[in-house]
Amino acid sequence: ILHKNVNIGFNGNLNLGLAYERNPKFNSSIDMNYRSGKLNFYGSYGNNLNENANFGNIFRPDENSEQIFNFFDDSKSHLIKAGIDFYLNDNNTLSFFTNQNIFDGATEGNTDIIYNNATTFNNQQTFLSDNENDSQQYNFNYKLDFNEDSSHNIELEVDHNIYEGDANTLNRFFGATTRPNFFELTNTERDRTTINLDYVNPLSDSVKLELGLQARLFENIIDYESNARSQNSMGTYIPTTTNFDYSRNIYSAYATYGKKLEKWSYQVGLRAETVKVETLARETDLQTNAVTEIPFDNDYVQVYPSAFFTYNPSEKNTYQLSYSRRIDRPGVGQVNPLPEWNTPLISSFGNQELQPQFTNSVEVNYTRNLEKGSVTAGVFYRLVEDEISRAVFVDRSNLNRIILTYDNFDNTSAYGIEFSSNYRPTTWWSINGSFDLYSQTQTSISERLTVPTDVATINDIVIESVDVDNVAWNFRMFNNFKVSKSLSFSAFGFYRGQNRNIQFEMKPMYFVNVGMRYSFLDSKATFSFNYNDIFNTMRFGFDGDRPFAQTGEFNWESNTWFLGLSYRFGSGKYRAKSRKRRDKDEKEGSGGVF
């Protein structure tokens, strides 16, 4: 057995990839690892050169009008990573790495508004946005092992992230519109520090105790300026600046206790946290120097219990019962009240007062081990408190426009069944599949107009409580066909059934991907080919009647082929010291229209 202080080795990996449908997408990377005695050095470089087209339309039957969207993104990013692991002795390890990411992107957009019954009202918006940002990550880790197999240990990890970005956007308008052209300048500075202390102690062969402390400190400052984005009380477009300061500090502690009996095992846990959120949006009218401040604070203390029970009456049968409560906090993009994007008929903003959502889950599962695989069946119930979701409201300054934002819905409940399986019918064919069917009930506040938009007033906006009952299902299957030791083929299929929420009814989404892999040069090199969405069916379609009737569809470059080549070199098998995986517990924005 080689001890840590005598291990020597060098290895690396080179990757090249090219994807294409309408536009090329290229990526490459190289990573290397060198181990000499107590020191392990590693580094990598990767780049992505992407061009993407997105397009869609929204039709409004009440006025027989259509919005036609065309967007084009061109981005370049470079990621550099370097790190070192220092094995002081068999029990103590120090580790440090840094990531440096440089991004440069541009987006061009065009929105046409077409009124089929009154073409003289047709108008158009174009925009050009440039975005540059740099992000840095610095990570330190110290681990102390109390025994030879490292099962009893204490570990300290400190992670610090810095983000700085600048964006400038030019919006231009043509046709039947009185809206002036305007620019937008945005500067973003973000700092995130996370400190974790984890302790693991196997008290015996059948008992395990884990304890931990965590601090997460986050601050985000955005400075925004525009010469004609906002309107004053008289309806005049005015130059403004807005500063949005968002800070969130989280301090938490957790404990889990697990024990194995003859045929039973269980693990119970509890995490407690205290959270302090402070936000301030400060808008200045550059014509009058009038200042409007909107503060919002949210302090709370929460606990998150969990329990997992497993019963193994035999090698072929396993029963599981679990309960958990978790949190999904709003992402910074969801709480940012500054404009995300806009068209002549849509404006998208975050919601500064967005609350976190909490999910309580109960699951019961049964697993049957077969001669050629396994099958798992289960039932579940989930209750989501203050669910975060997209919301659509009527723009009070122009009742023909909508405001797209995020809101907390009332409690959402769902129950259903799940099936999953991995099975090998033959020595050359393996299958992994899953299916879930669930019933969901949502309750929230929504808005709608009771008369056509051309004659509507603010008094025609109805605010009402809406209940939506929905049954939905999802299916996915992955097949792998091994022709020889070096050649294999794959096929993946996905289907998401029709789905309904407070605002929209989403149409089914489905696609099929195929691929192949071929290894050569003594399995050191691998060539891969993937063809995604081979029938070109993947798209997002919806119908809605709040605040007024509309139907739409959005598409992207999903029907792509991909060529990849990778090559492993060197004789060593050493890798950088891994980090513990942690739950981000933050809900991401949609990143698009709906």
Task: Give short role names for the model-derived ranges.
Residues 1-110, 127-164, 198-218, 256-258, ...:
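Membrane-proximal, glycine/serine-rich, low-complexity loop/turn segments characteristic
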Residues 54-64, 107-121, 166-175, 222-230, ...:
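Outer-membrane beta-barrel translocator domains and adjoining extracellular loop/strand segments
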Residues 192-196, 238-242, 349-351, 355, ...:
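Outer membrane beta-barrel strand-and-loop segments of large Gram-negative receptors
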Residues 15-17, 65-70, 121-128, 178-185, ...:
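Extracellular loop and loop/strand-boundary signature of outer-membrane beta-barrel proteins
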Residues 24-28, 74-78, 132-136, 189-193, ...:
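Residues that define the transmembrane beta-barrel architecture of outer-membrane proteins
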